[in-house]
C-alpha cells in the first residue's frame, strides 16, 4: 500500500511539473490589450447618435443624424462581422437620434431620443425574430422627454439619468428614473437625483464596489453661464441597496465618451478628446478606474483616430464603433480589442516546493497507517493525540481555502466589520468546555449524533447524521472547486488538475492514515498557513515607500479599520448583528459538527480536550487579525500601485492569490500556493474522516452490520475513499457544468436545515422535560421558520443560524410539554 501511495503522489507531482514547465515556456510577461485591424463597417449618411447594441452576436445600429443635423434616419443596419451588413429601411416610427440604448437578454431597449425640433418620451425594444429585426412599442413612456441621457441595466432594472429635456428652449435635466422589468406595468419611478446637477452625454456603467453592484456616473456636459456646453470631470456612484449617491471626486479626464466594466472591480474609460474642441486624429486614450481603491490611471493610447461613438461587448471582446462624419466622409469604423490575461509559469523552484509539501503529507499518511489496529485508532486516534495538536487541527479544519482567500478579500474591499465574527469563538468557548465536552466525554461516544439517540431516539440520530454527511460532501466539493478557480485564473493551473491533486492526495493520506494523519497534517498545514500569512503581511508593508506606517495611515484615512456601525439593525451587518451571529454560529459549529467534536474525542482526557478548545480559540484571535491585516495591506499597496492590479480576473476573492503570484519572490510563491492547498486540504481531510465516521458508527455498525466489528476498519477506509471520490466528482461536475450558483443554493438550503441542530443539542443538554416528539416538532418548525426568514429576508443572512437555533430550542421544549414521555 505504501509503495502504491508513493507512486501515486510522484505521478501527480510529475504531471504538475511537466504541465507547468511546458506552459512556462510560452507565456507573456504583462497583461495587455491586443488590438485588431481597423475596418470600415458602413458608408452612408446619418451616422451620429445612433441607437445600438449587440443582438444574437451581431451589432445593430438604428436611427442617427448627420453632422449638420439636416438628415435624420429611420433605418437600421445589422453588421455581420467586420464586413457586410443588412439594411432595414424605415424600421423606426419616426426619425430619431441621441437616445439611450440598453442591451437586455431578449433585445435592445431604446429610450427617448430627439429630432431637429424636440425630444421624445417613447420607449421601444428591438428584437430579432426569424432572422429579421422587429420593433416592439409596448413599453411605458418616460415621465418626461429625454435625449442624450445615460442608462444601464442593473438587477433586472433599467436606470436612466440626466439628459436633455428640450431643444428650444435648451434645457438639461437632472432626473433619475428606474423601470423594474419584472413589473414594467408599474411604469417609471423617480429616484433621488445625483448631487452633481444637470448633465447630458454622461457615461454610466455597472460595476461591483467590493460589496455589491453599483451604478457609476462619470463626466458628461453641462450648460455654462454663457449658454455653451462645458465638459464635466466629476463622478458619482449610486448604491441601489442603500438608495444613496456618493462622490468619486472631480479628477476624471475631459471628453470621456464610453465605458465598460472589466474584471471584478475595474471600469475601462474611453476618452476621445482632451479638450472642448474636436480635432481630426486627436489621440483616443484608454483609462482604468478601480472601484475599490478609487484610483485612475492612464492605460494606453488607442490606435484609432476617429470619434468614438460606442463601445460594445461582442464575443468576449469589446468592439469600438466610431465615425468621421464631422469631417464629411460619412464612414463607420470598427476596432476590436481583446484583453490578453497576464500569464506566467510557476517555475521549477515553486513547483519543487509544492512537490515537497505533497511528499510530506504522503509520508505522514504512510507512517500513521502502521499504528491502526481497529476503528478506535482510525476514528479517535486511540486517545493518543496531544491537546495542542488537537487544537491546531480544530483551527485548521475551521480555516478553509475559501476563508484563506475570502478574509483578506473582505478586508481589502470593505473594512474590519467581520473581524468580530471569527473572534466570537472566545465568547462560546466556555460553553463548549463546560457543557458539550463533559456530555461527549462521559458518554464515551464516537460521533456527536450517538448522543441524540441516547437522549431522544434512533430516528433523530440517523436523520441528523445523514444531513451532516450530505452537507460535508457538498462542502468538500466546493472547497475543492472554488480555490481551484482562483488558482486557475491567477496561475493558469488547470482547474481539473488542481482539483485532482488536492482531492487525490487528501483521499490517500486520510484513507490510510485515519484521524491521526488528519490531525498531524492539519498541524503542519496550520504552520504553513500562518507562516506564509505573517511573511505576506511583512512583505506587503515593506513594499510601500513608507513601510508599515504608510500602510496604517492609508488604512485609517480610508476607514479600513472600522468595525461597523453600532446601530441595532438586524437586517444589516452591524456590530451587534455580527456578535449575535458569531455566538450562535460558533456554538452550533463547535458543539454539534462531527468534524469538530471528533477532535475533542482524540485526546486522552477531558482536561486535554478542554485545552484543545482553548488552544483553537486563542489561536483564532491573532490569526484573524493577521488575515484581516493582509487585506488592509493589499488595499494600501494597490492604492499606491494601481498599475499592478489586473483587469481580467472576474472574482474579487482572487486578489490575495494574484498578489502572491505576481509580487512575491520565487520559492515563497510556492510556499503560499502550498498554503492555499493546505487550507483546502485541512478542511477536506477533516470533513472526509468525520463523514466516514458518521456513516460507519451511526449507520453501518448501528443498522447494517450490527456487531460485525472485525470488518469495521476495512469498511471505514472504504467509506472514506467512497465519500472522497463522490466529493471529488461533485467538484469536477461544478467545473464542467459551471454550476457554482447551484452550490450557493445547495449550501443555503442545507445551512438553513443544519441551523436547527445547535438548538436540538442544547434542548437535550439543558432541559429534562424535552422528549423525542417535541424535538422532531422543533426541527420541523425550525426548518419552516428558516425558509420563511430566508424568503422574506427578515434578518441579515448571518443570523440564519441564530433563528434556527432559537426556534428549534423553544418550539421543541414547548411541544415536549404536550407529550408524555419518560423524563431524562
Predicted features and spans:
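Kelch-like beta-propeller repeat domains
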Residues: 13, 24-346
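Bacterial N-terminal signal peptides
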Residues: 8-17
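Membrane-embedded helix-loop-helix hairpins and adjacent transmembrane boundary segments
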Residues: 341-824
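Intrinsic disorder/low-complexity signal
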Residues: 1, 30, 85, 105, ...
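Bacterial N-terminal signal peptides that target proteins for export
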Residues: 1-9
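Polar/charged alpha-helical tracts
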Residues: 3, 23, 241, 550-557
